[in-house]
């Protein structure tokens, strides 16, 4: 049993060989926040020792850390969909598309983490630490899935209601690449504007 220093307090069931050749090098990568490099080392170890509980747990942990890093990057960015006033919503199409793609990356990596955990639980179903970690990852996946779905629904449904032409300049709108503003004009109707056209409207008023 080996306890990893400074990362988490879960005992790892690894042989001395696994510890020397894979766990210790992976933890050195992780100490420098290179979780992708750490995961590569662990995956190499699992190619040689596919049933190692310790390496499987490290795989799930480093997948989680990669997902967490992407999530932190996204939280530092401006929100791609944000209200400007009552009944007015600004949508940055390019950033929304980018963020939806990054959400998918996070979901995939967390799915890989969950898969590694499930492999451990097949061998050792009463491992409380691993069971708790799986519950945590499941809750993360559920939250991300809801956020992604809400963003996708706003992004895809709103243009269907508002149409494809800017009220200001009457030119076509590319929702995938342009920043646009939706303005509610009644309980069932929406206007859509290019952001510069909407700003011009504000300057006139």
Question: Where would I find each of the regions flagged by the language model?
Answer:
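TPR-adjacent "capping" and linker segments in tetratricopeptide-repeat scaffold/adaptor proteins
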Residues: 3-21
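Alpha-helical segment of the N-proximal tetratricopeptide repeat
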Residues: 15-44, 48, 93, 100-101
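Short cysteine-rich clusters marking metal-coordination/redox-active sites
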Residues: 166-170, 194
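Cys/His-coordinated zinc-finger cores
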Residues: 192-203
């Amino acid at each position: 049993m080996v306890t990893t220093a400074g990362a988490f307090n879960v005992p790892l069931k690894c042989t001395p060989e696994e510890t020397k050749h894979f766990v210790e090098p992976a933890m050195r990568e992780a100490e420098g926040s290179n979780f992708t490099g750490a995961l590569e080392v662990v995956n190499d170890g699992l190619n040689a020792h596919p049933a190692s509980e310790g390496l499987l747990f490290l795989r799930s942990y480093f997948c989680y850390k990669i997902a967490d890093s992407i999530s932190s990057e996204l939280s530092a960015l401006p929100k791609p969909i944000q209200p400007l006033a009552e009944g007015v919503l600004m949508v940055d199409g390019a950033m929304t598309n980018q963020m939806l793609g990054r959400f998918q990356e996070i979901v995939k990596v967390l799915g890989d983490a969950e898969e590694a955990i499930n492999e451990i639980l097949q061998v050792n179903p009463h491992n409380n630490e691993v069971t708790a970690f799986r519950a945590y990852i499941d809750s993360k996946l559920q939250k991300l899935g809801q956020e992604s779905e809400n963003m996708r629904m706003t992004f895809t449904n709103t243009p269907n209601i508002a149409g494809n032409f800017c009220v200001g300049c009457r030119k076509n709108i590319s929702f995938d690449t342009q920043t646009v503003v939706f303005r509610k004009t009644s309980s069932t109707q929406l206007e859509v504007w290019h952001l510069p056209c909407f700003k011009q409207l504000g300057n006139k008023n």
